[in-house]
Amino acid sequence: MLLFQHPLAGIQLVKGTVETFDESYITAAKRELAEESGITHVISARYLCSWDSGFQNQAWHFVLCECADLEDSWTFHTKDDGGHDFAFFWHDIGSDISSQAHTVFQHALEKVRKLIDQGGV
């Protein structure tokens, strides 16, 4: 699973807001992926599910994006919050992130694990 180290806020998943101009959750996910990671070529994208995060009344929508030829790790300078360097890496879905991430990201990772266990991914 693609994660990144935010310089101020620990380990996170690519996420963001569905804007009024987004045609779908898939469109929003692809836009956020490009804005936060620099990944602009998505081979395919599939909506997985919605999830009540329990954090600030946020509903999250999981989208699986298939991309080709990505590095094992890279840094991308995003314009989010005035500009940050996000350090991206591939994370073993079974490994814990509890000491390095906000609980909402820990719970999101658990949700993805359940989707995999149920054959949804």
Residue ranges and their predicted role:
Residues 1-14:
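N-terminal strand-loop-strand
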Residues 52-77, 86-95, 105-120:
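Active-site-adjacent beta-strand/loop module that shapes the phosphate/pyrophosphate-binding cleft
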Residues 9-10, 18-19, 96:
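Short, catalytically relevant binding-site loops at active-site mouths
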Residues 43, 84-86:
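A short helix-to-beta-strand connector/capping loop
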Residues 13-48:
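The catalytic Nudix box helix
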